[in-house]
Amino acid sequence: MAKIADSIDSAQADSVENVESYSTETPESAAPAAPRPVLSVPGAAVGRRKEAIARVRLVPGAGAVTVNGRAFADYFPNKLHQQLITDPFKVLDLVGSYDVIARITGGGPSGQAGALRLAIARALNEIDRENNRPTLKKAGFLTRDARVTERKKAGLKKARKASQFSKR
C-alpha cells in the first residue's frame, strides 16, 4: 500500500513540474499583488431604491454597521438583506476596514437594503476612485436600480388590473 502511495505522490510531483514549466506568466506577474493600504479618509454618499433613501458615512474602523442608531443585525434581521449590504466590502476585500453610520428613511426592508448597498458602494468609490471604481462598476454596485412602482390608473383597480370584461 505504501508503494502505491509513493508512486502516486511522485506522479503528482511530475505533473506539477510540467504545469509550472508550461506557464506563460513570468514570476513577477504571477506573484500576488501587494495588499492595498486601507485609506484613512472618510467617505459619504446617498443611495436610493424604490421609495427608500439612505445617507451613509464611512469612517475607518473595525467594521461596525449602525443603521438609524441601531445595530445592523437588529435593523435587518433577514440574512439576504445583510448579505446584500455587505457585498461591496466583500468584492473589494475591505471587510472590517470601515465603520458604517447610516440614516435610512422611507420604503420597506428590501428597498432600504438596496439603497444602503448603493450608498456604501458610492462612498467606497469616493474614497479611492482609481482602485475601487472598476471593481464596483463591473459588479454592478454603482448602478441605480430605476424600477419603481407603477402608478394606479383611473378606471382600473390597480396599475394594470381591470375588472372582468363581459361582451354581452
Swiss-Prot record:
Signal peptide: none annotated. The keyword Protease does not apply. One of its GO terms (molecular function) is RNA binding. Keywords: Ribonucleoprotein, Ribosomal protein. One of its GO terms (cellular component) is cytoplasm. GO terms for biological process: translation. Pfam families: Ribosomal_S9. Residues 9-22 have a biased composition (Polar residues). Residues 23-37 have a biased composition (Low complexity). Residues 1-38 are annotated as: Disordered. Belongs to the universal ribosomal protein uS9 family. HAMAP family: Ribosomal_uS9_B (MF_00532_B). This is Small ribosomal subunit protein uS9. It comes from Leifsonia xyli subsp. xyli (strain CTCB07).
